[in-house]
From Swiss-Prot:
Chain intervals with Basic and acidic residues compositional bias: 443-457
Basic residues composition-biased segments: 555-571
Species the sequence originates in: Candida albicans (strain SC5314 / ATCC MYA-2876)
Name of the protein in its database record: Adherence factor
Compositional bias segments (type: Polar residues): 230-240, 465-480, 497-512
Keyword field: Cell adhesion
Compositional bias segments (type: Low complexity): 1-18, 47-68, 94-106, 115-141, 182-203, 218-228, 254-272, 585-606
Gene Ontology BP annotations: adhesion of symbiont to host; cell adhesion; cell-cell adhesion; filamentous growth; regulation of DNA-templated transcription
Job of this protein: Surface antigen mediating adhesion and aggregation in S.cerevisiae.
Residue segments, region Disordered: 1-20, 46-68, 94-143, 179-273, 443-480, 497-527, 546-612
Length: 612
């Protein structure tokens, strides 16, 4: 209120005869029956709105009403075209205006010098509004977006207003909305939502203010030259641009408003782009479960090892003879381990300068050259892979010892491991694990599988070309690729062939079988041996007949139902986990010899298979 300047202004002198402004006091209170005390305030509009308002002054008032009503009122478009009506806004009561103004000033406070710079602009806006509204005294409109429900009346002036004191022909604006329009705070909506249609009720002050401030950035884009459809749409969404009271503002406030809305729209668009492409620094639900699907399951000694791509399985190129002897290489490595300087190493080994000794050491350990040195090969990689499980256990023991030293308490490695497990499941980001970890693990897993497949194809091609058995490295890589093999404790190594499934490399499916099915000739001999054993067991009266017959029957039954191995998986696993039957002494020499030979062959087949 202090921004009103009571000094003489030539722009005010010509219109003081119709309405005399009173100099307001500092503690003036708005009263609905004393509008002469209230100072009409102004709003800030964009420069494009100001130009269009000056160009659109000669337009008729009916078109003004048709363009303003859909923006401010809940009227369908059909009703606005046929029955243009005049709207009248009731004055806000005293108890509702004060908290709104106080909340607006507390939330969005504009510096006081900002208003002092614009006293002259406010006076000019007041006089221009008064001049425009004076020729049309019966078409007054009071704009106030603090009132949620507006009043639609057929008469231009309500009876309550005719009985009260004559009000000035000045559009009333709520002063509390100016800082909200001028503030540079972003819109509360996280995503740019479409503008609400005119049929939707505007019952909230926040929705009306948001929609009122949203089109600030879109008015410059549309421009003055619009088509008919674009004008209807803009009338529905953003209201009239060239009608109503004069919308004049300085260029500084226009640029602030436009930059605010443009920045807000840009930030919301960037947020939408980030939400479409999943950010890596955000952790989504079920991260530990998804991480378990990517990482190899323990024991880590059975995890697939990526073969070295640089190692060529074909014929290697001929290497040139080195000028360093193997003795010099060993001396260089040993002296470097002892901490000798390069000058001393060069003098002792006699290789020449210290640069030659340093370069030779780097070639030996693989730091330079074509990386074909024997410092690190696939054998070392496999050896390190076998140490992972034991190293994991030792790691937790070391953590437990260090924790006991620092806290003077007694913890076990199991307690430390369980506590870390709980902390990791609560917040994986505290361990540096996020979505980027899963993405990198998936890439590494795909690369390992692709490399193993390529190496297997190369091995098959070389085997088919040379008709020679594959080398040990490729066999080891093939065995490491079998991820579905179950872990078997070494103490059950005697029964490993009964518990381990046979890998079907063609289809990748596992078939659970107790023993390999015998050929037809051997099956016939088994039937003969079964008859002999029946005779022997009946003569001895032993109790092992039913057990031996049951095991042979299970073997025949598995041979008959080999096409459906998964149906009898549990039954065969129970039967195959039994220890081999004891040797039966027989009185018949031929039958006992055949039984003993058969059992020895079966035991050799069981024990000769490799576990690792």
């Amino acid at each position: 209120m202090s921004s009103f300047n009571s000094n003489s202004n030539p722009a005010n002198a010509q219109n003081l005869s119709s309405f005399q402004f009173q100099p307001p006091k500092e503690d003036v209170i708005f009263d609905t029956h004393q509008m002469s005390l209230s100072v009409p305030q102004s709003r800030y509009y964009a420069s494009s709105m100001m130009q269009q308002s000056q160009q659109g002054q000669p337009q008729s008032q009916t078109s003004q009403q048709q363009q303003q009503q859909p923006f401010l009122m809940n009227i369908p478009p059909a009703f606005t075209q046929t029955q243009p009506q005049q709207m009248l806004y009731a004055m806000p009561p005293l108890q509702t205006q004060q908290p709104s103004s106080s909340s607006a000033t507390t939330n969005n406070v504009v510096p006081p010098h900002h208003y002092n710079q614009q006293q002259s602009q406010q006076q000019q806006q007041q006089q221009q509004q008064y001049q425009q509204m004076q020729p049309q005294p019966n078409n007054m409109q009071f704009f106030d977006n603090t009132i949620p429900n507006y009043l639609i009346m057929n008469q231009t002036i309500s009876p309550s207003q005719t009985q009260t004191t004559a009000q000035p022909n000045i559009s009333y604006y709520n002063y509390s909305t100016q800082p909200q329009l001028q503030s540079a705070q972003p819109i509360s909506h996280s995503q740019p939502q479409p503008q609400p249609q005119a049929t939707q009720p505007r019952s909230n002050r926040s929705r009306s203010q948001t929609s009122f401030s949203k089109p600030r950035g879109s008015r410059q884009v549309s421009g003055s030259g619009r088509s008919t459809g674009a004008k209807k749409q803009s009338a529905i969404t953003s209201g009239s641009t060239g009608t109503g009271p004069a919308r004049n503002a300085d260029t500084g406030m226009t640029s602030v408003a436009n930059s605010t809305s443009t920045t807000t729209m840009t930030t919301t668009n960037n947020n939408n782009k980030l939400s479409v492409s999943a950010p890596v620094n955000v952790i989504y639900a079920n991260l530990p479960e998804r991480l378990q699907q990517v990482l190899p399951a323990p024991p880590l000694s059975r995890a697939p090892v990526r073969p070295d791509v640089t190692v060529n399985l074909t014929s290697k190129r001929a290497k040139r003879k080195s000028k360093f002897t193997p003795e010099q290489d060993d001396m260089i490595v040993n002296l470097k381990k002892k901490g000798k300087s390069w000058v001393e190493i060069a003098e002792i080994t006699g290789v020449g300068s210290y640069l030659a000794a340093r370069n030779r050491f780097q070639v030996i350990v693989g730091q330079q050259g074509n990386n074909n040195s024997s410092a690190w090969d696939n054998t070392d990689k496999l050896f390190l892979n076998q140490l992972l499980d034991a190293g994991e256990i030792e790691k937790w023991r070391f953590i437990c010892c260090e924790l006991n030293k620092s806290t003077n308490k007694n913890f076990t490695d199991y307690e430390c491991r369980e506590m870390i497990r709980q902390l990791f499941w609560l917040n994986p980001a505290s361990f540096g694990v996020n979505e980027e970890t899963i993405i990198e693990s998936q890439k590494e897993k795909k690369l390992t599988e692709k490399t193993i497949e390529q190496r297997e194809q190369q091995r098959k091609k070389r085997a088919s070309a040379n008709h020679s058995p594959p080398d040990s490295d490729s066999i080891t890589n093939t065995n490491n690729n079998q991820q579905e093999v179950k872990y078997i404790d070494p103490q059950y190594k005697n029964y490993q062939s009964q518990l381990m499934p046979n890998q079907n490399t063609g289809s990748g499916a596992t078939k659970i079988s107790s023993t390999t099915p015998p050929p037809p000739s051997q099956a016939l001999s088994n039937n003969v041996n079964t008859m002999n054993k029946n005779i022997v067991s009946s003569a001895l009266g032993g109790t092992s007949f039913s057990q031996e017959q049951h095991s042979l029957h299970s073997n025949q039954h598995h041979h008959n139902h080999q096409q459906h191995p998964l149906i009898h998986h549990h039954q065969y696993q129970q039967q195959s986990s039994l220890p081999p039957p004891p040797t039966i002494p027989s009185t018949i020499p031929t039958s006992s010899l055949s039984i003993q030979q058969q059992q020895q062959q079966q035991q050799q087949q069981l024990y000769n298979k490799q576990f690792y």
